[in-house]
Amino acid sequence: MKSLGIDIGSSSVKVSLLDIASGECAASSANPATEMPIGSPQSGWAEQDPEMWWHYVCEGIRTIAAQGFAMSDVVSVGITYQMHGLVCLDKQGRPLRPSIIWCDSRAVEIGAEALEGIGREFCLAHTLNSPGNFTASKLAWVRRNEPGVFAQIYKFMLPGDYIAYRLSGRMSTSVSGLSEQILWDFEEERRADFVAGWYGIPQEMIPEAGVSIGTEARTDEAAERLLGIPAGTPISYRAGDQPNNAFSLNVMEAGEVAAT
């Protein structure tokens, strides 16, 4: 039995096949051979095409399969990804614009406005951070500057959520995903709708959130036809690179710190 690991970076997409019994990596692939392009239409902007990530996920899986490994042996899928990127999808699940990724700084002032408007102490108590340049602020930028795009958004999500959607057909996120978007209220242990409300983001645009560790989605028949992964395979892990870093280092208790 094998577990398939997918990592969506900003420079490459890495795919690994892990042997569950031994815990060893049976095969891995990183694509492309050179770095993925990052678009910068203006100074301080950084964008990538979500379809490019998916293309390299498929290429990586096929590269491993070509080495003689059967995707039919895969019994679970885990996804890690570059954090904070904004992916906007229409009702057909198509990206409406390039993803505004983690290193894009266009929404800094919007986040600063929200911090003062909502209240500095309230934000730090409930979201443990400033709205800053995180995903919700990036979406607020789209609302202000690209109203035609904003009007077509059915759901917005993170890079890892998009790959999970392409594998499963289900639009969802995780609680840790909401946290990195500044849409999780740690004080109340629920979604931070006050942030979405401040930004004018309709609640129905936010995908349903589940756990990072546990089955939140399963691969569908389309993924089986395209990649050979059996339909119904659980996507049992999904988290951004920093939660994944903390988990890998066993930084799990209050007061512990993982630095990168």
Feature-to-residue mapping (PLM):
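Pocket-flanking alpha-helical
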Residues: 109-113, 245-247
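N-terminal glycine/serine-rich phosphate-binding loop of ATP-dependent small-molecule kinases
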Residues: 1-97, 152, 207-208, 224-225, ...
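Short beta-strand-to-turn element immediately C-terminal to the catalytic PLP-Schiff-base lysine
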Residues: 18-19, 87-90, 142-144, 165-166, ...
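Carbohydrate-associated surface elements
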Residues: 104
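Catalytic phosphate/nucleotide-handling subdomain of diverse soluble enzymes
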Residues: 225, 233-260
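Short, hydrophobic/amphipathic alpha-helical packing segments
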Residues: 54-62, 136-139, 240-243
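Gly/Ser/Thr-rich active-site cleft segment
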Residues: 8-10, 122-240
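Residue-level structural signal for beta-strand termini and adjacent loop
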Residues: 30-31, 100-101, 177
